[in-house]
Amino acid sequence: MIDRKLLLQDFDKVALSLKKRNHAMDDELERLREAIAHYKKQLIELEGLQAFQNKVSKEFGIKMAQKMDTSDLKKELENNKIKLNELSKSVGEAEQEMDLKLSIIPNLVDEKTPLGASEEDNIEIKKILTPRNFTFKPKEHFELAQQNGWIDFESGVKLAKSRFSVIRGFGAKIYRALIHLMLDFNEKNGFEIIYTPALVNEKMLFGTGQLPKFKEDVFKIENENLYLIPTAEVTLTNLYNDTIISVENLPIKMTAHTPCFRSEAGSAGKDTRGMIRQHQFDKVELVAITHPKESDAMQEHMLESASEILKALELPHRFVQLCSGDLGFSASNTIDIEVWLPGQNCYREISSVSNTRDFQARRAKIRFKENQKNQLVHTLNGSSLAVGRTMVALMENHQQADGSIHIPKALEKYL
């Protein structure tokens, strides 16, 4: 959540930053402006009544000490106290309304994030490994998966509906091996392996920014205050929800393998074949909680950690700086890693490493103590990596003319 003090002091500066996202936010910002104005008005009235109460109380005390008649002052104090209680309640309600309006406003755009309207304006930073020159026309992953009997798309539809898959046989062994390899690499780079619940309550999803704005994107358990996690970012970050961390314990680096569940609202017609876009998928996530001065360096570290896995699997990829119009809700700055898919003849996102600055920390009340003062941490998250998409990239990049798949040396020991 954006700093309320900043909004109260300089609303226009905040609005200018948010408009860099190129979203139609005028209505939301106007409603927030009105809520802030109402809160300020109520607060000023309350402070006026409190000042009056203090003044009359002082007069009452003086007259009492002088044994003078205080009946009028007593009545005035009683009447004012009733007004104070009513106005205090109104101020509390106005504050809640302001915070509700504020909770659906995305993070401020980082100064390092380039301006742009959409993914078309994202900027390539660098390429790593050169795509292979094929002597035959490369197939897409779903053709290879079916040919090798690794992925059963029809059974996924039968068991659930579209955008679900069944992985079996040697394909399942590769899938499992990829998870183990990713966790081992992440652990080697200093990230603690953690297994968390796949269900969380509403407060946790608020903390990382999925709720209340993106309720349609997550699966809710009927008649329960529980949701299936869209990413382990939610559980790992919220392990420290409402926590004060000693500065000596920063940074905190965590990794987790979890199933992830997304409704993919608004994705109708996109990537309808194969494993690129699924309602349920596995992901190995990185989350870091850092001192504000260290978050930029941590973002680079997380990117290199994810890239290291792709290099070990001999998968060409590139770093892409997201522009302001393509940022996620909680992100202030994001760099994607896109992997080359020869079957599609294009790069596709396989990791997204975001620095949310203190946006999530403010929502989730994650603080650190330094010099006897509590301050907000910075939180970062990123995939390392999306398992299904990594398997897709492995199949397409390492396919042979006969449809068989070459196994990279780094993966052999896990099979």
Swiss-Prot record:
Location in or out of the cell: Cytoplasm
PROSITE patterns: AA_TRNA_LIGASE_II
Subunit: Homodimer. The tRNA molecule binds across the dimer.
Sequence positions that bind ATP: R262, S263, E264, E349, I350, S351, S352
Residue stretches spanning the membrane: none
Keywords carried by this UniProt record: Aminoacyl-tRNA synthetase, ATP-binding, Cytoplasm, Ligase, Nucleotide-binding, Protein biosynthesis
Pfam families: Seryl_tRNA_N, tRNA-synt_2b
Family per record: Belongs to the class-II aminoacyl-tRNA synthetase family. Type-1 seryl-tRNA synthetase subfamily.
Function according to Swiss-Prot or TrEMBL: Catalyzes the attachment of serine to tRNA(Ser). Is also able to aminoacylate tRNA(Sec) with serine, to form the misacylated tRNA L-seryl-tRNA(Sec), which will be further converted into selenocysteinyl-tRNA(Sec).
Gene3D superfamilies, per database record: Bira Bifunctional Protein, Domain 2 (3.30.930.10), Serine-tRNA synthetase, tRNA binding domain (1.10.287.40)
Gene Ontology terms: cellular component: cytoplasm
The keyword Aminoacyl-tRNA synthetase appears for this protein: yes
Cross-referenced HAMAP family: Ser_tRNA_synth_type1 (MF_00176)
Protein name (database record): Serine--tRNA ligase
Signal peptide residue numbers: none
GO biological processes: selenocysteine biosynthetic process; seryl-tRNA aminoacylation
Entry-linked InterPro entries: aa-tRNA-synt_IIb, aa-tRNA-synth_II, aa-tRNA-synth_II/BPL/LPL, Ser-tRNA-ligase_type_1, Ser-tRNA-synth_1_N, SerRS_1_N_sf, SerRS_core, tRNA-bd_arm
EC number(s) stated in the UniProt entry for this protein: 6.1.1.11
GO molecular function: ATP binding; serine-tRNA ligase activity
Comment text on domains: Consists of two distinct domains, a catalytic core and a N-terminal extension that is involved in tRNA binding.
Catalyzed chemical reaction(s): tRNA(Ser) + L-serine + ATP = L-seryl-tRNA(Ser) + AMP + diphosphate + H(+); tRNA(Sec) + L-serine + ATP = L-seryl-tRNA(Sec) + AMP + diphosphate + H(+)
Binding site residues for L-serine: T231, A232, E233, E285, S383
Biological or metabolic pathway of the protein: Aminoacyl-tRNA biosynthesis; selenocysteinyl-tRNA(Sec) biosynthesis; L-seryl-tRNA(Sec) from L-serine and tRNA(Sec): step 1/1
